[in-house]
């Protein structure tokens, strides 16, 4: 009997230190499909956790029913230790325990664990004994064998008290990871009929949150006669029946102002018409977890209302499941499309209104590092990442990801992303693309799911440097400032383009430069800021006072305002860098330099060592150059490091290889 996880399994799997060892690990989050036969997982060995784990091959074909916190034995994995990025690729596994309801130990992030000398005082590999005695057998994977299955919630649970749920329903959609659903992109996997949960007759109490879906009744006595199409639904109270495919499933959420719960699914019928189906309160509890994206279902006896909220619901009408409703889970029906994409281009957003939805297929130009933002609404921290992308309209735009999605984003330059139901926003009279409540993101999706991908790839491979140099920033109107952007460039080209600022002072220039830091000015390095508004604050006796927020602090937040000289093989230039980039360059927070300034004995030497250590290092810089005016109205050109990435020789070599391959494709197409 397996009684514990394998200590340091994560590090061993990453470095392939013992290929014959079968490591026991915990899957913290259920596998998430990211491409055909590829599932992403977050795993733990009790001492550290790792987000970039993947199931491929045999593991990918059987992993869809794995639950959060289950324990598996890694039987086969791929030696990927020579790859430039740390990741774990598992090709086969054995399920050990599926009934685990808690995290084993208190694992920390792998990088933190590694930097601390593989030490974590709160880590543990011991599996609690109650799980060993209760269910030591592997749960069998239930496959649907009937052509159709009738799913109805158990009557005995209708009046069951609702367990407490985190109050996330009313939170701002754009900053919650639950708003963005990464949909199964493998058409073969989407075609599979998902198994219905059946009664396992175990005594798990599920910590009081067991929805008891295991007692659902299964029947095959339904039929598909008198089907109605979504476009013909009527809110007349008469019985209606529809046959649809699930294209999106939302999470179970709770209301803010009154007790209650909700989840919804988006569906599509054979004509490509869409609508949203909602489940409320005890009905939501009973059906939550039963559906999977790609399933074909028949729904009978439901309520229909006119859709008055197109921001959250699809179609002209909304459907609500009630106690009399019946749902049949059907076999695959190829006449019903997988998903509907009303593709438009970045330039089309100028003709849309704020709040409108748009479907885009874009090519990644660059992405910034994950940043931490303080939300003004509640002073809570949120992670964000900006994706700079473009399409065939040769216009680029920034699309911002928030929360865990920003942290998990793993695409690179040239990758293709599909945004379904992105939301048109507006900031300072300029249109922008926002990630809304119902936005779906597909990273490098299969061409079978979106046939348009083939044409986009072909177009991207055919681009030459002259065409790339004409890509412009999307603007809110034709009279707005012009922005010039290119992929990889050099400092001598940047300096030539800066001359154009004399005739077009509103222009902004974006360049990605591979260069190194030559010198960092030692004063000023930072300013003392308020923790809330980030504005400059002054010392008042023993406290620091923010006039803007009317708050006092024992210490300030020392934030970088660096001035540094960078160079490449063509030229040098003075640039500015602010706090997040400064921390990346110097490796410490600005507070360290403030402490050094206060240390009259050793402070000067400490500052000198830190600054010297940061010089002569090579990076990839994303630079923004624009013209600014000082208090006297004098114009000056200013270049700021917008983002920075470590120089990776293996990645640079791959870029050269990719460029050669792209050139060969162009040569073949243009003999």
From Swiss-Prot:
Short name of any one Pfam family annotated for the protein: Rep_fac-A_C
Start-end of DNA-binding region: 240-322
Matches recorded under CDD domains: RPA1_DBD_A (cd04474), RPA1_DBD_B (cd04475), RPA1_DBD_C (cd04476)
Biased composition regions of type Low complexity, renumbered to the chain: 199-213
Keywords from the named record: DNA-binding, Metal-binding, Zinc, Zinc-finger
Source organism superkingdom: Eukaryota
Its biological purpose: As part of the heterotrimeric replication protein A (RPA) complex, binds and stabilizes single-stranded DNA intermediates, that form during DNA replication or upon DNA stress. It prevents their reannealing and in parallel, recruits and activates different proteins and complexes involved in DNA metabolism. Thereby, it plays an essential role both in DNA replication and the cellular response to DNA damage. In the cellular response to DNA damage, the RPA complex controls DNA repair and DNA damage checkpoint activation.
PANTHER family hit by this protein: OS03G0429900 PROTEIN (PTHR47165:SF4)
Oligomer and partners: Component of the replication protein A complex (RPA), a heterotrimeric complex composed of RPA1, RPA2/TEB2 and RPA3/TEB3.
UniProt family annotation: Belongs to the replication factor A protein 1 family.
The name this protein goes by in its record: Replication protein A 70 kDa DNA-binding subunit
Species this chain originates from: Tetrahymena thermophila (strain SB210)
Gene responsible for this protein: RPA1
